[in-house]
Amino acid sequence: MKDENSISFLSSNENYLYDKSENELRPKVFEDFKGQVNVKETLSIFIRASKERDEALDHVFLSGPPGLGKTTLASIIAFEMNASIKITSAPAFDKPKDIIGILTGLDEKSVLFIDEIHRLRPIIEEMLCIAMEDYELDWVIGQGANARTVRMPLPKFTLIGATTKPGKVTSPLYARFGITARFELYSEIELVEIIKRNSLILNIEIEEDAAFLLARSSRGTPRIANRLLRRIRDIAQVTGSLVITSDIVSIGLEMLRIDGEGLDEQDRNILRSLILKFNGGPVGVDTLAISVGETADSLEDFYEPYLIMKGFISRTHRGRKATEFAYLHLNLEMKEDGLNENQRVSF
């Protein structure tokens, strides 16, 4: 049996799932995992109950925008269950033998984390559904008239599936998950807690005002907050400062072309395109994405959640529309018979 709490990756392509440079900042236990209070409280109860019964935790489905900690939480779940975890993503399963090798190599009560689970191939999904429900695996040996099906027992394991597109997960697969949780964008207060905790890990002090300014520019996403914190730390180091001040954060954000609302250059390009090319909308997501050189998936997964949360874009049945707040932010005049551009904000 493998060591408890071990973390293994099933492909070198999983770097985006668990960046080693970010590993030192990842919380290892629930106590250090900031935000997502309801998710943590619910999971804590289910984990405790499973441990008291000496059973594997039921399968867990995690959804929400990227960068909110789904992979990190999966590792924490494994830690709390005293179990090993294997981390992979749906595109890594190309053929049935890929999933067979992984499932047969699992330990009792171990955790298998699959990111982008909505991208599973149908034949892989069918095999996984059987494994999740019956803890058995049907394996076809031979071909043609000589083919026969061998049923292999599997250990009682926990599958944690994560996705940014829960609507694309099929009903049969979704029904196999006994626990579901949705991640929401973090509040500024929660991000401040994360930034202050991680600044200590990075051996740099940060002032309260500076932490709030950094949090306000992090799009409600811990991954972005951590990335910005590292870059601001670089600036503080080069300028000879032992403390990150609000002035240093402002310098860093200006260098990175991030404005006071946390919008970067591409965010502003999206708003400008929506207003200037499509008269404020409504316009379909595919058309809007093409106009700014993005895919519809990246627009919906990365940019839209924050722009909608901040009130810059509204989503209607006819498409995306720019709000009055978007016009004000870009210093554009909103008129019923068209638009006059008064002055663009320069960054």
Curated annotation (Swiss-Prot):
Function (record text): The RuvA-RuvB-RuvC complex processes Holliday junction (HJ) DNA during genetic recombination and DNA repair, while the RuvA-RuvB complex plays an important role in the rescue of blocked DNA replication forks via replication fork reversal (RFR). RuvA specifically binds to HJ cruciform DNA, conferring on it an open structure. The RuvB hexamer acts as an ATP-dependent pump, pulling dsDNA into and through the RuvAB complex. RuvB forms 2 homohexamers on either side of HJ DNA bound by 1 or 2 RuvA tetramers; 4 subunits per hexamer contact DNA at a time.
Keywords, alphabetical: ATP-binding, Cytoplasm, DNA damage, DNA recombination, DNA repair, DNA-binding, Hydrolase, Nucleotide-binding
One CC-aspect GO term: cytoplasm
Positions of transmembrane segments: none
Residues the record lists as binding ATP: L25, R26, G67, K70, T71, T72, E133, D134, Y135, R176, Y186, R223
Coiled-coil regions, chain positions: none
Compartments reported by the entry: Cytoplasm
Residues engaged in binding DNA: R315, R320
Molecular functions per Gene Ontology: ATP binding; ATP hydrolysis activity; four-way junction DNA binding; four-way junction helicase activity
Sequence similarity: Belongs to the RuvB family.
Subunit structure: Homohexamer. Forms an RuvA(8)-RuvB(12)-Holliday junction (HJ) complex. HJ DNA is sandwiched between 2 RuvA tetramers; dsDNA enters through RuvA and exits via RuvB. An RuvB hexamer assembles on each DNA strand where it exits the tetramer. Each RuvB hexamer is contacted by two RuvA subunits (via domain III) on 2 adjacent RuvB subunits; this complex drives branch migration. In the full resolvosome a probable DNA-RuvA(4)-RuvB(12)-RuvC(2) complex forms which resolves the HJ.
GO aspect biological process, one term: DNA repair
Sequence segments annotated as region (Small ATPAse domain (RuvB-S)): 187-257
Enzyme class: hydrolase
Gene: ruvB
UniProt-listed CDD domains: AAA
Binding locations of Mg(2+): T71
Keyword set includes DNA repair: yes
The reaction(s) this protein catalyses: ATP + H2O = ADP + phosphate + H(+)
InterPro entries noted in UniProt: AAA+_ATPase, AAA_lid_4, DNA_helicase_Holl-junc_RuvB, P-loop_NTPase, RuvB-like_N, RuvB_C, WH-like_DNA-bd_sf, WH_DNA-bd_sf
Protein name: Holliday junction branch migration complex subunit RuvB
Region (Large ATPase domain (RuvB-L)): 1-186
